A protein has these predicted regions:
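Short amphipathic alpha-helical segments and helix-helix/interface helices
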Residues: 49-53, 98, 152-153
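A generic local structural motif
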Residues: 45-50, 72-73, 121-123, 179-181
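Non-catalytic C-terminal accessory region of glycerolipid acyltransferases
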Residues: 2-38, 103, 107, 118-225
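Residues that cap or initiate secondary-structure elements
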Residues: 48-50, 67, 92, 142, ...
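Hydrophobic helix-cap positions at the C-terminus of alpha-helices
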Residues: 52, 75-78, 127, 220
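Catalytic core of membrane glycerolipid acyltransferases/transacylases, capturing the structured
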Residues: 57-114, 175
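Conserved beta-strand termini and adjacent loop/short-helix elements that scaffold enzyme active sites
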Residues: 45-47, 89, 111-114, 196-198
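A short, well-structured juxtamembrane/interface segment
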Residues: 33-58, 67-71
Length: 225
């Protein structure tokens, strides 16, 4: 998904940098992820289902980095009315992720993953104005875990667009020893979804802060340990 990231529009030629055996390996990984995702038993009550499928206008879909494993399956099941764009590093390594995103149904936008710079914001603003959703991991790609960088609010403020916060609770999952303790759910396990839709401004007309987003996302994304 869109990490905090200056950028340029995704260039199909850059995706083709990953070829041959490497591209075949990515295809196998993407196929495994799709099959794995379909075994998961997503649970959401009626109100949550409605919020997860929110489609009144283009939105920023926000999920913690350590829950990305289920994002593609969430998009497939609930985000059926719009394409979802995700920011990917403009580096050579980013070509791998861009190709992988294409294979799982996301549209990559190439750019820096180190700072949410002016060019990054401009490109994502244009994506939303064209009628598409964007995916954002507010604490990615390097953390700190569960810290929302203020830059992620730039795009929604400029478009006066809502944030669809996606909370995920895993009933059974492995956790990696990465900076974010990344979750990998067991096949056929239950995944509990929660959701909160935040407007660009609150009821008093005040702009959302990074702390507002962090508190709301933590509240719907409980950890088991």
């Amino acid at each position: 998904l869109a990490h905090n990231g200056g950028l340029q529009n995704e260039n199909p030629a850059s995706i083709n940098e990953v070829r041959g055996a490497r591209r075949a390996l990515l295809w196998l990984l993407a196929a495994l992820l799709r099959v794995w995702g379909r075994t998961l038993r997503f649970e959401a009550d009626a109100a949550t289902h409605e919020r997860l499928s929110y489609a009144d206008e283009p939105a920023a879909l926000v999920i913690w980095h350590n829950r990305l494993f289920v994002s593609a399956e969430y998009f497939r099941r609930y985000r059926t009315k719009r394409s979802v764009y995700a920011l990917v590093s403009a580096s050579k390594d980013g070509a791998w992720l861009a190709a992988f995103y294409r294979m799982i149904g996301l549209i990559p936008v190439r750019g820096s993953s180190s700072n949410f710079g002016r060019e990054a914001g401009k490109a994502l603003i244009e994506v939303m104005r064209a009628g598409h959703d964007i995916g954002i991991t507010p604490d990615g790609p390097r953390g700190p875990m569960y810290v929302v960088e203020p830059g992620v609010l730039v795009v929604t403020r400029r478009n006066n667009a809502p944030m669809v916060l996606v909370g995920v609770e895993f009933t059974r999952a492995w956790r990696l020893k990465s900076w974010d303790r990344f979750y990998i759910p067991w096949p056929f396990s239950r995944v509990i979804l929660r959701c909160s839709v935040l407007p660009a401004k609150n009821a008093n007309g005040e702009k959302l802060s990074a702390d507002d987003v962090r508190a709301a996302l933590i509240a719907i994304s409980p950890d088991k340990d």
